[in-house]
């Protein structure tokens, strides 16, 4: 038996994301007042994705509780749709985008923090909030993947969706630069056009890789779980 029910964990994670978003939006930073506001940053978009995803998880839990034993076929159909949406969102957005934000942020930060998160931001963003945006995303999504089985979409549709998201965000970053004359991320100012194309192409490939990683990890976790349950059943059968 789990020490903490997964439903309680999801609710706690959802509340933590709501707190992080509220605290982040309350910060008065110059970048929030410029074109695109917070929506030009992938970190903020990811926070919204995670909050919406865990909101759907909590809604699914509540719906499952309310429909349990009711025998109402229409309610069961709606619950299945909600579960399908939850699974799709984890596969296509919550896992790949969340892992991408954590990995890329800390890799660039370790190399040269001024390229991704200038020291000036320490005057606006407290350390706990920075970790809430760029660190805890990973363990939270792994907890969700471990506590609930998620049905991935077909590989072609999943990869198409993550490619669409990646290209859409890249075009959005380029549009912000076109309008303001400034790149969203400082390191893009220091590389040439060719290097930017390579970087954008590499990030799209990385997003696809993370989608596949999530699929493999999900299958591994639940295939292992199934094998363990079958092993436990053997003595009973004997």
UniProtKB/Swiss-Prot annotation:
It is a multi-pass membrane protein. Induction: By dihydrotestosterone (DHT). This is Androgen-induced gene 1 protein. Hydrolyzes bioactive fatty-acid esters of hydroxy-fatty acids (FAHFAs), but not other major classes of lipids. Show a preference for FAHFAs with branching distal from the carboxylate head group of the lipids. Residues 1-12, 68-87, 145-156, 217-238 are cytoplasmic. Highly expressed in heart, ovary, testis, liver, and kidney, at lower levels in spleen, prostate, brain, skeletal muscle, pancreas, small intestine and colon, and undetected in peripheral blood leukocytes, thymus, lung and placenta. AIG1 expression is higher in hair follicles from males than from females. It is found in: Cell membrane. The gene is AIG1. The chain crosses the membrane at residues 13-30, 45-67, 88-110, 125-144, 157-179, 194-216.
């Amino acid at each position: 038996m789990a020490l903490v029910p997964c439903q309680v964990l999801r609710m706690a994670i959802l509340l933590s994301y709501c707190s992080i978003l509220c605290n982040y939006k309350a910060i008065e930073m110059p970048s929030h007042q410029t074109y695109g506001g917070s929506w030009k940053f992938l970190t903020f978009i990811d926070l919204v994705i995670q909050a919406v995803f865990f909101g759907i998880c909590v809604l699914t839990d509540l719906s499952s509780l309310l429909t349990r034993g009711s025998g109402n076929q229409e309610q069961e159909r709606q619950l299945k749709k909600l579960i399908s949406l939850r699974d799709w969102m984890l596969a296509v957005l919550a896992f790949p985008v969340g892992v991408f934000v954590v990995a890329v942020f800390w890799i660039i930060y370790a190399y040269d923090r001024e390229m991704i998160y200038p020291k000036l931001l320490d005057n606006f963003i407290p350390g706990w909030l920075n970790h809430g945006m760029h660190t805890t995303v990973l363990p939270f999504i792994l907890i969700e993947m471990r506590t609930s089985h998620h049905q991935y979409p077909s590989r072609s549709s999943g990869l198409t969706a993550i490619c669409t998201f990646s290209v859409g965000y890249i075009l959005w970053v380029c549009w912000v630069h076109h309008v303001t004359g400034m790149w969203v991320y400082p390191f893009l100012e220091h590389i040439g056009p060719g290097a930017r194309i390579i970087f954008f192409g590499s990030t799209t490939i990385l997003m696809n890789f993370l989608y596949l990683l999530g699929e493999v990890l999900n299958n591994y976790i639940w295939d292992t779980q199934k094998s363990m349950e079958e092993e436990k059943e053997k003595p009973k059968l004997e």
